[in-house]
A protein has these predicted regions:
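Flexible, glycine-rich active-site loops centered on histidine and acidic residues
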Residues: 2-14, 75-142
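N-terminal beta1-alpha1-beta2 module of alpha/beta enzyme domains
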Residues: 1-61, 155-158
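Short, charged beta->alpha transition segments
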Residues: 53-57, 85-87, 147
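Active-site glycine-rich loop that binds ribose-phosphate moieties when present
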Residues: 142-149
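Short, surface-exposed connector motifs at secondary-structure boundaries
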Residues: 64-67, 150-154
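Short linear capping/connector segments at secondary-structure termini
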Residues: 37-41, 70-72, 114
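Structural preference for beta-strand elements that scaffold enzyme active sites
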Residues: 2-6, 33, 64-71, 96-100, ...
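Alpha-helical structural signal in soluble globular domains
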Residues: 25, 29, 57-62, 88, ...
Length: 161
């Protein structure tokens, strides 16, 4: 059995240096994974770190932890940007990235207030299409008329959860 920590990068943990220190301590105490939420807004929380930038700090502060966002809403992140960010982070981490994909929710207007798709069925279609694109691009294949390189460190691709 593996053990992972699921952290909301909010408040004090919105500082990627603090988050990286927490991850390093978790690794030193035998934890196997370190995962962060991906939100733009959340209830009364004001300070929220970008998970991809924060995970870059975590990657450089650790050596063996599996890392990743749980979950990233593809409808908000855009597949092409997500593919590039994830491949870069996977290379930086030495192949330790896991990407959790999901619909995301519009709780508190987290999507609609920024002009993003709020309808769950439409987000579901975007998730399906996005997962197919990510799979192809991370395998080094052409999709939507383009190849996105470099490929991630993991083969055949980054694990999708």
């Amino acid at each position: 059995m593996r053990r992972g920590i699921f952290v909301a990068p909010f408040g004090e943990l919105a500082d990627p240096r603090v988050l990286a220190e927490v991850a390093a301590r978790a690794e030193a105490h035998g934890w196997d994974g370190f995962f962060v939420w991906d939100h733009m807004l959340y209830d009364e929380v004001e300070a929220i770190a970008d998970p991809w930038v924060a995970l870059a700090a975590v990657a450089t502060a650790t050596r063996s932890l599996r890392i990743g966002p749980l979950v990233t809403p593809v409808a908000r992140r855009r597949p092409q940007k997500l593919a590039r960010e994830a491949a870069t982070l996977d290379l930086l981490s030495g192949g330790r990235l896991v990407v959790g994909l999901g619909l995301g929710g519009d709780r508190g207007g987290e999507l609609s207030r920024f002009g993003e798709e709020a309808d769950p069925r439409a987000r579901g279609a975007l998730l399906d299409t996005g997962a197919e694109l990510l799979d192809a691009w991370w395998r080094g294949e052409e999709a939507a008329g383009v190849r996105l390189l470099p490929r991630p460190a993991q083969r055949p691709r980054i694990p999708l959860w």
